Regions:
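Active-site-proximal beta-strand elements of phosphoester/diester hydrolases
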Residues: 15-25, 45, 179
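CN hydrolase (nitrilase-like) catalytic-core segments centered on the catalytic cysteine
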Residues: 24-109
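Active-site-adjacent bridging/hinge elements
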Residues: 42-44, 150-159, 179, 187
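Composition- and surface-driven signal marking solvent-exposed, interaction-prone regions
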Residues: 33-35, 57-59, 100-103, 125, ...
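ATP-dependent adenylation/nucleotidyltransferase module used to activate substrates
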Residues: 25, 142-143, 169-224
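Beta-strand-turn-beta hairpins that frame and shape the catalytic cleft
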Residues: 3-20
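C-terminal beta-strand edge segments of enzyme domains
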Residues: 71-72, 76-168
Length: 224
């Protein structure tokens, strides 16, 4: 079969279905990969010939990451190296898994993709439950060699705590602001102007105290 409505189902590899879009498809307002994802593809392959101009690599990288995030999928982008940059990118649900160096005549880019994670994330989204356009797609059964290999991907034991100090501080500040805003709205809604907190000396009660202080300051309430 030939067309833009093909989903390739690898029956011998669990949760592995892929679809293909070509080059500029990714850059248009409504990329075909969005329909592919809604039709069940969890890996998108893009065979590209992207020309190189100053600043385009960063834009391309963000575009691939964002498309993989929107569609909760893995996105594999490969660009020719003949007269272009040869920029290869693998992104999974908004996260960069691997990318090649540009302007190299010969390179292979590979990375580990967590298909089970993608399937789990999609189960949380009602968007992927019912899609009337699925009937326009044709499922093509394929088989790939499925051999045991070592995991090459680094798995962070603390995935929600950034290793970079600046990013970690920014993340903590964001969490504090979210909790502060939530408490502030609740105090405004109930008309409450005082709070009683049991301080044990542990982290939880300390955080509760800090959030309460910030919320009271934001509302210009007396801390006492």
């Amino acid at each position: 079969p030939f067309g833009t409505n093909l989903i390739f189902d690898c029956g011998n590899i669990e949760n592995f279905t892929f679809a293909i879009e070509i080059c500029e498809d990714l850059w248009v307002p409504n990329p075909p990969s969005t329909n592919h994802a809604l039709a069940g593809a969890n890996v998108i392959l893009n065979l590209s010939a992207s020309d190189e101009i100053t600043g385009k690599a960063d834009y391309r990288r963000k575009l691939v990451e964002m498309q993989s995030a929107k569609n909760i999928c893995a996105y594999i982008y490969s660009s020719t190296d003949l007269v272009f940059a040869g920029h290869n990118i693998i992104a999974e649900n908004g996260t960069m898994v691997a990318q090649s160096k540009r302007f190299e005549s010969s390179n292979i880019t590979y990375g580990d993709i967590d298909l089970d994670k993608i399937a789990t994330e999609r189960q949380r989204m009602t968007t992927f439950y019912v899609n009337p356009d699925n009937e326009d797609y044709m499922n093509v059964s394929v088989k790939l060699k499925n051999k045991e290999v070592k995991v090459d991907r680094y798995i962070d034991k603390a995935p929600f705590v950034p290793s970079d100090t600046n990013k970690r501080n920014a993340r903590c500040e964001e969490i504090l602001e979210i909790q502060t805003w939530g408490l502030r709205r609740r105090l405004e809604h109930t008309g409450c102007s005082n709070a009683v907190i049991g301080i044990s000396g542990g982290l939880d009660s300390t955080l509760a105290l800090l959030v309460t202080v910030k919320a009271f300051d934001a509302l210009r309430l007396d801390r006492k």
